[in-house]
């Protein structure tokens, strides 16, 4: 008898897999390898062959039903880590059958109010001191439950390829991805939110560091001599559009996000995230930073400002549109599950963005998790169960279309 997705999910969120942007290790935290090894043991108990790499990438595969070996492989991917923005250690979860109103989160003073359509459904919440970890342990739980059920029910299927990656939250989920070893030419990430969601358009992303060199002097005799790197950095920031920041943008609007700053009189740094859905707009944003630095260097007659820009990932839409059947099959699988599908923008990135750019088209599917990266994160059990059914249907759709072809 397959394990319910809820009990599997509750086991998974007990693992502390918060990633770290500063450790310099791969994986960035040891808990991710611990979880990968535990999941490998689960797969082997199902009779599924799998391997875990030194960097905590897990790969599993279920061979095709006899006679269907030549069908194209279906790949499913989720990530092991949780956000470094909020603690994911010692998660105290509870399951509430929601009948309306606010759900209090322990003694934290925080509350959650799910959408009205969830009345009568089971909601998994925390005590308000940690995130829940539905991003992305809901995706992992759903994939594992799908694998268990497709084997238990002896449903005919083509080759199935599974991957769980580390460090997605810090942008390193695909750093050591074994494309050839994975063995699928296309896949889906399960890293979305609301039931029915299919995402294949995400931000173009870049990171910029603005370095400001100052000149220190004794404050009592600094007139005409001191060049304060901190106030110069503030002036640089003032040249950027004040409304184009995360807290004032939505939909297709891009932004400049000052995510970190440090410094003293002699030296200061500003770290920015640049985000937009349009490639031309991304170039404009980069050029604005460079122009601001050039303007201030001329104004102060010194080479005080330097801008370093590095691309992070691209909008995967251009890659997914070349294989439209991926979204069409997902739509069909959802409709068979009684779910109304919809497309939405990812105001962020997923492993799928980098995978798609590197030749593995990979749209993103829903998991039934909400409020990611926060202490008010929650998951809907009935939606998680629907996600498992969607995956079963997806395997059917892939098989049916391939056989007809």
Where does each model-flagged region fall?
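N-terminal capping segment at the start of a domain
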Residues: 2-30, 125, 313, 373-374
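Flexible, glycine/charged-enriched surface loops at secondary-structure junctions
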Residues: 21, 53, 156-159, 242-257, ...
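A non-catalytic alpha/beta surface segment that caps or lines the substrate-entry region
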Residues: 24-77, 81
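Active-site metal-coordination/substrate-binding segment of hydrolases
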Residues: 68-156, 164, 386
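Midchain, well-structured core segments that form catalytic/ion-binding scaffolds
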Residues: 99, 108, 113-115, 121-134, ...
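Short glycine/serine- and small hydrophobic-enriched flexible loop segments
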Residues: 144-151, 235-242, 393-396
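Active-site-adjacent substrate-binding region
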Residues: 231-248, 255-257, 304, 314-363
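Zn-dependent metallopeptidase/amidohydrolase metal-coordination segment
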Residues: 264-266, 341-390, 394-398
């Amino acid at each position: 008898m397959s394990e319910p997705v809820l009990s599997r999910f509750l086991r998974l969120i007990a693992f502390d897999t918060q990633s770290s942007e500063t450790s310099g290790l791969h994986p960035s935290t040891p808990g991710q390898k611990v979880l990968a090894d535990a999941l490998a043991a689960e797969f082997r108990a199902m009779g599924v062959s799998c391997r875990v790499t030194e960097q905590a990438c897990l790969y599993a595969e279920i061979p095709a039903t006899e006679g269907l070996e030549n069908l194209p492989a279906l790949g499913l991917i989720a990530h092991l880590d949780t956000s470094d923005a909020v603690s994911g250690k010692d998660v105290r979860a509870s399951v509430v059958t929601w009948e309306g109103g606010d759900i209090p989160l322990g003694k934290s003073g925080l509350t959650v109010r799910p959408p009205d359509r969830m009345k009568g459904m089971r909601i998994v919440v925390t005590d308000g001191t940690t995130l829940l970890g539905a991003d992305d342990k809901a995706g992992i739980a759903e994939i594992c439950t799908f694998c268990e059920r497709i084997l238990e029910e002896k449903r005919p299927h083509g080759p199935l390829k599974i991957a769980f990656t580390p460090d997605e939250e810090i942008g390193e989920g695909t750093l050591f991805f074994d494309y050839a070893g994975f063995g699928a030419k296309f896949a889906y990430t399960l890293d979305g939110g609301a039931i029915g969601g299919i995402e294949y358009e995400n931000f173009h992303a870049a990171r910029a560091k603005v370095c400001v060199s100052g000149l220190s002097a004794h404050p009592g005799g600094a007139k005409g001599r001191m060049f304060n790197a901190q106030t110069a950095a503030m002036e640089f920031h003032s040249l950027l559009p004040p409304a184009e920041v995360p807290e004032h943008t939505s939909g297709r609007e891009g932004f400049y996000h000052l995510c970190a700053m440090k410094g003293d009189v002699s030296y200061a740094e500003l770290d920015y995230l640049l985000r937009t859905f349009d490639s031309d707009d991304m170039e404009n944003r980069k050029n604005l930073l460079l122009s601001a630095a050039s303007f201030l260097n001329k104004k102060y007659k010194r080479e005080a400002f330097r801008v370093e820009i590095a691309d992070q990932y691209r909008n995967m839409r251009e890659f997914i549109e070349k294989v439209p059947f991926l979204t069409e099959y997902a739509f069909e699988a959802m409709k068979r599950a009684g779910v109304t599908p919809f497309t939405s923008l990812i105001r962020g990135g997923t492993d799928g963005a980098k995978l798609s750019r590197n030749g593995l088209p990979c749209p993103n599917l829903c998991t039934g998790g909400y409020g990611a990266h926060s202490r008010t994160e929650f998951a809907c059990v009935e939606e998680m169960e629907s996600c498992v059914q969607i995956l079963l249907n997806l395997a059917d759709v892939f098989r049916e279309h391939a056989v007809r072809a």
